[in-house]
């Protein structure tokens, strides 16, 4: 066959990526070269992180056989990371689930039984019985769902409707609680609206990049490649990287800073002090667009109320704040001197000053990037607020090339978990369940009785674990997440509840994960391009894809599972009589009729799909389900600064960044000339706040929930590696990625290893107050912790590092701190 220059370049890109990771050229590259004419290509966003790279998916004979970077995608411009090039192989692991599995003994369900294949009708029969029994005996608070930032937009929306409107339970929360909740609360406190004001286009215009607790080189490698290009092509560009240990992003750093865990709060306040002391405040911006408030302190650690740390806290969980003057704020940050900061953080003074100068220099455009180092933090909301302070003091915000930017880790943590409102306290478009007006808006749009949606906030992720253990949450459905491996404190707070005979656990997943194997019922799930989908990435870019192949066996999408299960419930079985009396026409209808087969959702015919276009759910139901759900959902944000484009526009584009007004996307929010919601002459308007002003918060340093002592003498930090994504349930089934990083290791400083008579390659027992795991000593490699700290990734199901972690959370966001707990080591 003829091989075009473009095909040759694509194949070489794959080969180069494989070579960079020390791998042989995969079949993906060979497919591009050898079968170009036989492969059908279509676009999709990548299945992995929140960057939102565009890929071209190659299908042949009903299978995904190839994948390449989409040269027309503005995010990645044709480049993929090593995981992206192996996307086809995540779908075809040898142990892919193809039929429902129920624990059974002697032909019926048994908590201690063996997993046995059953039909979907049988699976729904058991689920129906468990849900109806719990609802009848204990009410809506006895059921719950744990969802995902990997749900498609309409899957998250359908789940939220089913639980909040159908079952009248706000006990639905996404795994984004573990990664982005602190960012959400930080945005809401400072700006009154969620999500970043900038976009990836800032990279090519910035003068300085500051990474706070973010290893972009491995976790957001495509964005890092753009930063690297910017840094290496302009000698005046500066990169600063802050972390508790050295990692691959330090290789590009002009100023690489290692600080004592938790002391990032000190550094942030020091920089604010430096800006004020050096008269570097942008007075015009500051005087017009900023308010000052002092936040409540000593707010606890989100542990059980009986925990000594919670009992000792003066203001546990308090989000309170009060106005303060500039002079009071100036005096507050003045305590964070250079000398004090250097002492508390362990960072040399010259490095601190260099960092502060970047923010203070009025001629430098600065972008602050952060991910889990800030968010998975018992003061994660504060850390978010404090970095916003720096940009608000200097006016370096909402303009090309400068601004604070919270990066996301999952493909639709923004588009689904946050924007749709699948958190236990949220509704679509930044609305919340505690606000009567917001509930009323949803109830009217959904045509359900007033008072249907509960006003009480539901159980967040960690609270769900505790309620399961305590026997208060009895039916629990998890989708598109592996929380038994990814969540904190497995031994004490999660496993007991999952295996409690009072509780029934359902896991929907493509593979037999740690979570699935701990459940009672496993539902086989369609993944990625086996369904039509939509994700929203970190820069507010919403991206669609078509179903391109069918799922194996009886595997069904999460959307299908939710919608079909809703047929099992009539309104009389889930709503009290006083609600039905308000809308008697809904009596006798199923939740499917009320929530999904409504005139609003079902008005788009299947004929809108091309004749040969796959869409299993819509063709089965007889209407274009995804379009109906999306257009209903999009209504909530239009006209309110969350405007999404019409459904069909997304299938034509490589994503659009909201707000999309009059067909035009928005790159920079809150600034005149960029944001359609900011009028001429306003300059800047932070319209999430009633007065249009953002808030600078005065917030102090407070210590971690658990720190090393004489017995448990090391800090433990957990995280990811380039080759694997989250718990590895997809990437470890790709042979090439598995070979590249086959098992987790314990990264440790050579002197700490030597002091414990440990050598590289030794087996070592890592012990905390909550559990222990066996790992392998690594004194070299990509991650280089300082003395006193060890680092361990969580992708390895054979080394469940979250047996060790503490379920301490930020009291405001309820997000777990996976970066700081105390451990000791024992040689095996």
From Swiss-Prot:
Its EC number is 1.9.6.1. SMART domains: Molybdop_Fe4S4. Substrate binds at residue 794. Predicted to be exported by the Tat system. The position of the signal peptide cleavage has not been experimentally proven. Binds 1 [4Fe-4S] cluster. Residues 39-95 form the 4Fe-4S Mo/W bis-MGD-type domain. The keyword Transcription does not apply. One of its GO terms (molecular function) is 4 iron, 4 sulfur cluster binding. Pfam families: Molybdop_Fe4S4 (PF04879), Molybdopterin (PF00384), Molydop_binding (PF01568). Belongs to the prokaryotic molybdopterin-containing oxidoreductase family. NasA/NapA/NarB subfamily. This is Periplasmic nitrate reductase. The gene is napA.
């Amino acid at each position: 066959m003829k091989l075009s220059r473009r095909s040759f370049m694509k194949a070489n890109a794959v080969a180069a990526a494989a070579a960079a990771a020390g791998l042989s050229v995969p079949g993906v590259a060979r497919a591009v070269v050898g079968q170009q004419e036989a492969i059908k290509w279509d676009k999709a966003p990548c299945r992995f992180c929140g960057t939102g790279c565009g890929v071209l998916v190659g299908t042949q004979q009903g299978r995904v056989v190839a994948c390449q970077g989409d040269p027309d995608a503005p995010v990645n411009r044709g480049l993929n990371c090593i995981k992206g090039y192996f996307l086809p192989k995540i779908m075809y692991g040898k142990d892919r689930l193809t039929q429902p599995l129920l624990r059974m003994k002697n032909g019926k369900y048994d908590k201690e039984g063996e997993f046995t294949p059953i039909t979907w009708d049988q699976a729904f029969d058991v689920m129906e019985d468990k849900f109806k029994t719990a609802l009848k005996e204990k009410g809506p608070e006895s059921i719950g769902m744990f969802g995902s930032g990997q749900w498609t937009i309409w899957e998250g929306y359908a789940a939220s409707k089913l639980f909040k409107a159908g079952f009248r339970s706000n006990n639905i929360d996404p795994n984004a609680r573990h990664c982005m909740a602190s960012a959400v609360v930080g945005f809401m406190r400072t700006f009154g609206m969620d999500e970043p004001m900038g976009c990836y286009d800032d990279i090519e215009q910035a003068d300085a990049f500051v990474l706070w607790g973010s290893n972009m080189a491995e976790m957001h490698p495509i964005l890092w490649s753009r930063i690297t290009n910017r840094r290496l092509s302009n000698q005046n560009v500066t990169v600063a990287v802050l972390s508790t240990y050295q990692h691959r992003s330090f290789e590009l750093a002009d100023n690489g800073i290692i600080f004592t865990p938790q002391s990032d709060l000190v550094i942030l306040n020091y920089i604010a002090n430096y800006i004020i002391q050096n008269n570097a405040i942008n007075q015009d911006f500051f005087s017009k667009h900023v308010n000052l408030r002092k936040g409540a302190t000593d707010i606890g650690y989100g542990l059980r109320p009986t925990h000594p740390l919670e009992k000792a806290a003066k203001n546990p969980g308090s989000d309170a704040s009060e106005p303060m003057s500039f002079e009071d704020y100036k005096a507050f940050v003045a305590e964070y001197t250079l000398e004090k900061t250097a002492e508390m953080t362990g960072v040399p003074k010259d490095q601190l000053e260099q960092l502060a100068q970047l923010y203070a220099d009025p001629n430098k455009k600065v972008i602050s990037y952060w991910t889990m180092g800030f968010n998975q933090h018992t003061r994660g909301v504060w850390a978010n607020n404090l970095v916003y302070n720096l940009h608000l003091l200097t006016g370096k915000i909402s303009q090309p090339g400068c601004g604070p930017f919270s990066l996301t880790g999952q493909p639709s943590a923004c588009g689904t978990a946050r924007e749709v409102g699948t958190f236990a306290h949220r509704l679509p478009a930044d609305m919340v369940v505690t606000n009567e007006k917001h509930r009323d808006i949803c109830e009217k749009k959904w045509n359900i009785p007033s008072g249907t949606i509960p006003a009480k906030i539901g159980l967040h992720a960690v609270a769900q674990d505790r309620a399961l253990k305590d026997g208060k949450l009895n039916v629990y459905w998890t989708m598109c997440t592996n929380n038994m491996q990814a969540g904190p404190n497995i031994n004490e707070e999660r496993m007991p509840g999952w295996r409690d005979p009072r509780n029934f656990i359902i896991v929907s997943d493509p593979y037999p994960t740690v979570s699935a194997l701990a459940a009672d019922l496993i539902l086989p799930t369609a993944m990625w391009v086996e369904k039509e989908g939509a994700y929203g990435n970190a820069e507010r870019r919403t991206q669609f894809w078509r179903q391109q192949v069918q799922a194996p066996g009886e595997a069904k999408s999460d959307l299908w599972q939710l919608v079909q299960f809703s047929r099992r419930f009539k309104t009389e079985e889930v709503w009290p009589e006083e609600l039905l009396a308000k809308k008697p026409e809904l009596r006798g209808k199923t939740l499917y009729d009320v929530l999904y087969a409504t005139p609003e959702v079902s008005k788009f015919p299947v004929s809108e799909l091309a004749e040969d276009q796959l869409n299993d759910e819509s063709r089965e139901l007889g209407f274009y389900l995804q379009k109906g759900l999306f257009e209903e959902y999009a209504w909530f944000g239009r006209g309110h600064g969350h405007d999404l484009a019409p459904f069909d526009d997304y299938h034509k584009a490589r994503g659009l960044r909201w707000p999309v007004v009059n067909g035009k996307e928005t790159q920079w929010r809150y600034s005149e000339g960029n944001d359609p919601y900011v009028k001429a002459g306003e300059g800047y308007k932070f319209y999430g706040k009633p007065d249009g002003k953002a808030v600078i918060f005065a917030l102090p340093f407070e210590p971690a929930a658990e720190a090393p002592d004489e017995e448990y003498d090391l800090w433990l930090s957990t995280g990811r590696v380039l080759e694997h994504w989250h718990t590895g349930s997809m990437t470890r089934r790709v042979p090439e990625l598995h070979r590249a990083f086959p098992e987790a290791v314990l990264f440790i400083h050579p002197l700490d290893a030597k002091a414990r008579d440990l050598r590289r390659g030794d087996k070592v027992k890592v012990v905390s107050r909550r559990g222990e795991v066996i790992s392998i000593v690594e004194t070299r490699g990509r991650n280089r912790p300082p003395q006193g700290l060890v680092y361990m990734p969580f992708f390895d199901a054979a080394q469940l590092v979250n047996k060790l972690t503490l379920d301490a959370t930020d009291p405001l966001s309820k997000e777990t701190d996976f970066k700081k707990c105390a451990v000791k080591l024992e040689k095996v």
